[in-house]
């Protein structure tokens, strides 16, 4: 599952703004988005990933995604860097 991918990834960026920045700079290899995030956030990140031809994986929980990133709060989006 994608939570394990995040745990095993060498370099990640956490959060919507940083994820979109990594996509625009061509640094993201994969994007993980939490399905319980606000719809406009999901759409914005997904659109940026599609534009950059980067695969998007959806997970069910912001809280679990944040935990996989070793932070104490939820994460709406995470990019695994190249």
From Swiss-Prot:
InterPro entries: Ribosomal_eL30-like_sf, Ribosomal_eL8/eL30/eS12/Gad45, RNA_bf_YbxF-like. This is RNA-binding protein GK0100. Transmembrane segments: none annotated. Keywords: RNA-binding. The lineage of its organism: Bacteria, Bacillati, Bacillota, Bacilli, Bacillales. It comes from Geobacillus kaustophilus (strain HTA426). The keyword RNA-binding applies. GO terms for molecular function: RNA binding. It comes from the Bacteria. Belongs to the eukaryotic ribosomal protein eL8 family. The keyword RNA-binding applies.
């Amino acid at each position: 599952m994608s939570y394990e991918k995040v745990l095993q990834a060498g370099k990640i960026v956490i959060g919507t703004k940083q994820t979109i920045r990594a996509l625009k700079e061509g640094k993201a290899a994969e994007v993980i988005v939490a399905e319980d995030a606000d719809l406009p956030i999901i759409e914005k990140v997904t659109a940026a990933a599609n534009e950059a031809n980067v695969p998007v994986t959806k997970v069910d929980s912001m809280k679990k995604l944040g935990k996989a990133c070793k932070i104490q709060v939820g994460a709406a989006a995470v990019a695994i860097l190249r």
